[in-house]
A protein has these predicted regions:
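Cyclophilin-like peptidyl-prolyl cis-trans isomerases
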Residues: 1-171
Length: 171
């Protein structure tokens, strides 16, 4: 069985997402490592764009923060075969212009966005609680796409079903 991550929001709402090690193995290793360390606990979705995606995973909450390292971008444009499409509920890694600049920031798709396919490392999909994604995507935001009321992740856990996932390779 593939690993399953559970997001519990501050309001008690829950999302579950299946991760796909066969699609983006190092990206999944990284996400599992960060979840197990409690890295995402208490962080917010700092960038929310209705009809596009919700983005979180930044310890600074500004869009500039990360875990202090980067991982190689597991997507086609970067020479890595990844055919997972950016459809509603898909998890993918945020990054800067540099294809190998992803760290901890991730986004969850609200609507299908084909222009991201092959350009970002998609690595999982929400299997339960897509209504929670939709609700977050529809909250009022300011001019910089930041929710007026913080959309906080209380905590995240991962069930690896007994499989050991190694620490990520970093760049």
């Amino acid at each position: 069985a593939n690993p399953v991550v559970t997001f519990t929001m501050a309001d008690g709402k829950v999302m579950k997402a299946e991760l796909y090690p066969e699609v983006a193995p190092n990206t999944v290793n990284n996400f599992i490592s960060l979840v197990k360390k409690g890295f995402y606990d208490g962080l917010v979705f700092h960038r929310v764009i209705r009809g596009f995606m919700i983005q979180g995973g930044d310890p600074q909450g500004t869009g500039m923060g990360g875990p202090g390292y980067s991982i190689k971008g597991e997507f086609t444009y970067n020479g890595f075969s990844n055919d997972l499409k950016h459809t509603p509920g898909v998890l993918s890694m945020a990054r800067a212009m540099d294809p190998n600049s992803a760290g901890s920031q991730f986004f969850i798709m609200h609507e299908t966005s084909p222009h991201l396919d092959g350009q970002y490392a998609a690595f999982g999909k929400v299997t339960d609680g897509l209504d929670v994604v939709n609700k977050i995507a529809e909250v009022p935001t300011d001019y910089s796409d930041r929710p007026l009321e913080p959309q906080m992740i209380q905590n995240m856990t991962v069930d690896t079903f007994g499989v050991e996932y190694p620490e990520p390779e970093t760049v």
